[in-house]
Amino acid sequence: MGREPEMEEARENGGVGGSVLPLASLISPTGNEVQISELEGKIIGLYFAANWYPKCEAFTPALTAAYHQLKEHGAGFEVIFVSCDENRPSFERFHRAMPWPAVPFGDIGCKKRLSERFQVEGIPRLVVLAPNGEVVQPDAVELVHRYGDRAFPFTSARVAELEADEQRKFASQTLEKIFSVSGKDYVNGSQEQVPISSLVGKTVGLYFSAHRCAPCIKFTAKLAAIYSNLKGKAEDFEIIYIPMDKEEDGYLRSCSDMPWLALPYDDGASSGALARYFDVREIPTLVVVGPDGKTVTREGRNLVNLYFDMAFPFTDEQIRLLQEMEDEDAKGYPPSLRHTGHRHELSIVSDKSGGGPYICCECDEQGLGWAYQCIACGYEIHLRCGRDMEGRAE
C-alpha cells in the first residue's frame, strides 16, 4: 500500500498522536480526559460511526467483542470513535456503549479534517493505522465482521493468511464439522434429540431467524409451506432452526411455529458460533448445505423467494435450469402492458436489458431479472403479476 503524504507528515511529527489526531486529548465513555500519549506505539482504529444508523449499531458489538479479546491478550490496539452524530445527547448515548475513547463531540474541526483526510463517504468505517501513522487498512469493517479479533494486526499478509485458512476450512467441511463449531452433536426434534450424524447425506438448510423479527415471521410461513411440499415429495431435505433469539421464551415461541429441527438454546453461544462461521449479517438467512457437507449457497432465502420449492436442491445447476425456463416463459408475455397499479405503461425487461434484483410492487415479493418496469418511476412487477392483473381487468 502506498504511503500517503499525510502519513509521512505523521511520522515527522511523532506518529499518530502528533499529526493524524492533532488535539490535546480524547474523552473516555464516562467523559474523562484521555491523554494522546496513551496511544503511542499502538495500532489505532479510527471508528467513524453514528448512533442513528442501524449498520453502525450492528457493527459496534462485533468491534467491541474483538476489542475486548485483543485487550485480554495484551495486543497494542486502540479504537477512537469519530462521531457522525447530529447532536450531543446521541453522541453521548452511543459512546457510553463503547469501551474506547472518542474525539470530543464539540471538536468539529478535528472530525472534519479526519473525515476529509481518510475520504470517509460512508459509515460505519474503520480506518486502521500503524503506530507510525501509516494506513494499514482503509476500511476494516468487513474484516472484523468476518474474522473478529483474529484480523489483528489487519495487514495484507494477515488477511491473506486468514483467507487461505478459510478456503481450507470450507474445502474440508462436513455437516458434523460444521456443528462441532457450535459444540453440539445433536439438534432437537419435536419429541427427541436427533444426532447430527443421522442428517449426513441430506440437503440441510440452516435457518438463522428469531421470534421478534417481522421479516423472519413472513419468511418462516413461506419456508414452512415449501418444507411441507418437499417432504410430501419425499425429498431428502431437512431444516435446522439456528436461533438468534436473545431470550429462551422467544426461542420456544419460534420452535412452536416451525415444523423442523432446532439447535438447542444456550444463550446464543452455539448460534453465534455458527453465525460467525457462515458470516451471517442479517436475519432471516438460509444457508444450504449439500449431501456432501459442503456449502451449496448462503442465499437460500433469496432462492426460496424467487423460485419457491423449485429451487431445491439449490445447486448452481438447478438455478441455471430455472433461469433458462424463465427465459423461455418470457417469450409468451407481451412486450408492454398497462397495469392498474401504475399510471404509466410498463415495458418488459431482463437482466440483460436493465432488469435486476427488485421487490414486486404488486405482491411485495422478491424478483430478479425479468420484470415489467416503468423506467421513469422505477415501478417494477413480476411478469406473472402483470399478466394476472391484466387478466382481472378485462
UniProtKB/Swiss-Prot annotation:
UniProt name for this protein: Probable nucleoredoxin 2
Annotated family: Belongs to the nucleoredoxin family.
InterPro entries membership: C1-like_sf, DC1, Nucleoredoxin-like, Thioredoxin-like_fold, Thioredoxin-like_sf, Thioredoxin_domain
Uppermost EC category: oxidoreductase
Positions of the Thioredoxin domain: 15-176, 180-327
Keyword Oxidoreductase in record: yes
Disulfide-linked positions: none
Gene Ontology MF term list: protein-disulfide reductase [NAD(P)H] activity
Keyword terms, alphabetized: NAD, Oxidoreductase, Repeat
